Amino acid sequence: MLPMSMKITKSTKLSGAQKDMICQLWNMEYPQKLAITPSAFDEFLEASASQTHFLIIENERDLVGWAYTFDREGDRWFSIIISHAHQGKGLGHVLLNLIKEKENRLNGWV
């Protein structure tokens, strides 16, 4: 269950602002050697099909979590990133359960 200050949005396309927020989250949570630029993130997204994005927004402005399902090479995949300040609070579990409502087979990308 999400705190009242948070909501989840779901979309198949991301706005430029959403992409920027996801890049910031990615770069905060992954090691420096896995840092991604906005243009590299666009290339990353373009390499996959049937995308669905789930964004956890806190206080109507701050991205604290992102989940992404996509097709690649005939398989269905997912990825989840949660802000380190919000890890251990069940947000990843909430996102995974949302994904599992529509998917019966998934491969994780970490």
Name these PLM-found stretches.
Residues M1-S39:
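Short amphipathic alpha-helix that is part of the acyltransferase structural core
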Residues L2, A47-S50, K100-K102:
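Flexible, charged surface loops at secondary-structure boundaries
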Residues A17, W77, G90:
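Residues that form or flank phosphate/diphosphate-binding pockets in enzymes
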Residues P31-F54, E58:
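Active-site rim helix/loop that mediates acceptor-substrate recognition in acyltransferases
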Residues I56, R61-D71, R76-I81:
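Conserved beta-strand in the GNAT
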Residues S79-G88, V110:
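A short, internal acetyl-CoA/4′-phosphopantetheine-binding micro-motif in the GNAT/acyltransferase core
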Residues G88-E101:
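Conserved acetyl-CoA-binding loop-helix of GNAT-fold acetyltransferases
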Residues E101-V110:
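Conserved GNAT acetyl-CoA-binding A-motif
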